[in-house]
Amino acid sequence: MATSASSHLSKAIKHMYMKLPQGEKVQAMYIWIDGTGEHLRCKTRTLDHEPKSLEDLPEWNFDGSSTFQAEGSNSDMYLRPAAMFRDPFRKDPNKLVLCEVFKYNRQSADTNLRHTCRRIMDMVSNQHPWFGMEQEYTLLGTDGHPFGWPSNCFPGPQGPYYCGVGADKAYGRDIVEAHYRACLYAGVKIGGTNAEVMPAQWEFQVGPCEGIEMGDHLWIARFILHRVCEDFGVIVSFDPKPIPGNWNGAGCHTNFSTKNMREDGGLKHIEEAIEKLSKRHQYHIRAYDPKGGLDNARRLTGFHETSSIHEFSAGVANRGASIRIPRNVGHEKKGYFEDRGPSANCDPYAVTEALVRTCLLNETGDEPFEYKN
């Protein structure tokens, strides 16, 4: 089980320098989604004072030819601050800054899905769409082997690991706890965490978040997890099926509701939304992973608590369905529903936008509707 060389560097020595005063200066780490649509990049700049709002953060640029976002002959891309969080690594007053990416001509970059998602969310703000996303992930050594697994064989079969306790059942809990606390410090709306069905697989939940906030908070939570794993010398994988065979995949189940769904009699509105989703299954499958459904095809097999990628289904408390209505929602006749389609490496902006387009804007067909400004 290989760990990175950086994890063997003395953290005590680093801590000695991190305690040095920084005067009035502030370090702002700018974070963005690269051309893959699923990986993150970051770089840091010095500010003269602590920013209190996005307006205090300057626009910046980067070399898009090194992030799969531009050609070398015209490589400058723009970073426009979109959301700001406390920095749990450098501590206050330093900041994490999630950015949107724009091309040389100020047009939105191809993987800047936040840009259109924000417009769609603004159109339905009076319906107060809430989201909660359940991010599953797998811990790996730098050699790609699952963290804690025997080097030349497999661990025992699935069964004792989900919410498991003990060194033989929970692999990597220190990472999970560090990530949880770092998210709380940063201001991420992290809701909880648990060990998952496959050993070395974990989940954290973010939400409820309203509108565009869902994507902002999940992307920053992912960034923080990558950085925590970097410190521990391991890798976090959001691959939806990291280990072939009789092992669970990794999803990002998405809980969705509107004000009407959360009020008395809301089950009627939930059922109406599910009916709309049933008629637009393939559109959602394409939106639910960065490769247009190819990644999810390895996960949505109809086995290991998944539905078939080829068929739409829904049911109360059914984890083998495309859409699950929680049992308490069925009992209380109001609440939310869970879309079990999104893959672990999905873009939350794409997922939440697709749900709003279909369920609230009543779009149909295989392509998103183009709205005029």
Swiss-Prot record:
Its EC number is 6.3.1.2, 4.1.1.15. Glutamate to glutamine ratio influences catalytic activity. At glutamate to glutamine ratios greater than 4, decarboxylase activity ceases. In the presence of manganese, synthetase activity is limited to concentrations between 10 mM and 20 mM, whereas decarboxylase activity is not affected. Both catalytic activities are inhibited by avidin. This is Glutamine synthetase. Glutamine synthetase that catalyzes the ATP-dependent conversion of glutamate and ammonia to glutamine. When expressed in liver, it may be involved in detoxifying intramitochondrially generated ammonia. Also acts as glutamate decarboxylase by catalyzing the production of 4-aminobutanoate (gamma-aminobutyric acid, GABA) in a pyridoxal phosphate-independent manner. Expressed in retina, brain and liver. Little or no detectable expression in breast muscle, pancreas and spleen. Residues 24-106 form the GS beta-grasp domain. PANTHER family: GLUTAMINE SYNTHETASE. ATP binds at residues 134, 203-208, 255-257, 319, 324. Keywords: ATP-binding, Cytoplasm, Ligase, Lyase, Magnesium, Manganese, Metal-binding, Mitochondrion, Nucleotide-binding. GO terms for cellular component: cytoplasm; mitochondrion.
